[in-house]
Amino acid sequence: MEFCGGTLRTRFQRTSVPNSPVTVVHTVAGSGKTTFIRNLLIDHPQLVARTYGTPDVPNLLGYGIRDRHGDAHIVDEYPAADLRSHPSVSIVFADPLQHHGEVRPAHFTCSHTHRFGKSTCSLLGTLGVYCTSDKEDSVTFAGAYLAEPVGTLIALGEDAELVLDNHRVEYFTPCQALGLTFPSVTLLTDAPIEDQPPVSRYIALTRHTDSLLILN
């Protein structure tokens, strides 16, 4: 898909990985890859894009990011895919930190997020995840019974889920929260953040736009 190469270079950083039949693009959460794919479809309406995440709602224009079923030129969240199901694929996208599946070497990357802010980037940095942001947000730690939850609740760990179930409080698990964004998130974790599984931890820490309260 040579005609997209210039477009990719305007938005993503080219790595030293040699060209291959399928171009691989890796981004951090909130980088704008979904918007980029939608704009690519506007500029090239002959393309078909499919996602292993949440597809777009059908629209009057007749194009958007479709569900996973069928051939495609573009596949989003590709670590969850069997690319043999998409023989025409030329570009694949993913935030590889959100997946357990095998990932390919990236031709293009983006480590800048438009979702959360600098405080979250600093926290992620202590966990080995490098990303940048131009905006401000807040990250606060507190004891599980010493602060009131704010916004949407995410439970990290089975014991955290059990506590919220016993209190009949609605919450998301990281798997359920994947692909969702909320202004404020309260994360109840049953172990120190650094001891939690990396994929679930990363998803849970990147769902908010303004504030994150971590209760342990």
From Swiss-Prot:
Keywords: Host cytoplasm, Host-virus interaction, Inhibition of host innate immune response by virus, RNA-binding, Suppressor of RNA silencing, Transport, Viral immunoevasion, Viral movement protein. It is found in: Host cytoplasm. Residues 1-110 form the (+)RNA virus helicase ATP-binding domain. It holds the Pfam family Viral_helicase1. One of its GO terms (cellular component) is host cell cytoplasm. GO terms for molecular function: ATP binding; RNA binding. Residues 111-216 form the (+)RNA virus helicase C-terminal domain. InterPro entries: (+)RNA_virus_helicase_core_dom. One of its GO terms (biological process) is transport of virus in host, cell to cell. The keyword Nucleotide-binding does not apply. Transports viral genome to neighboring plant cells directly through plasmosdesmata, without any budding. The movement protein allows efficient cell to cell propagation, by bypassing the host cell wall barrier. Increases plasmodesma size exclusion limit. Acts as a suppressor of RNA-mediated gene silencing, also known as post-transcriptional gene silencing (PTGS), a mechanism of plant viral defense that limits the accumulation of viral RNAs. TGBp1, TGBp2 and TGBp3 seem to act together for cell-to-cell propagation. TGBp1 is the main movement protein that physically cross the plasmodesma with the viral genome. TGBp2 and TGBp3 would facilitate TGBp1 function. Belongs to the Tymovirales TGBp1 protein family. Homodimer and homooligomer. Interacts with capsid protein. Interacts with host AGO1; this interaction targets the host protein for degradation, thereby suppressing the antiviral RNA silencing. This is Movement and silencing protein TGBp1.
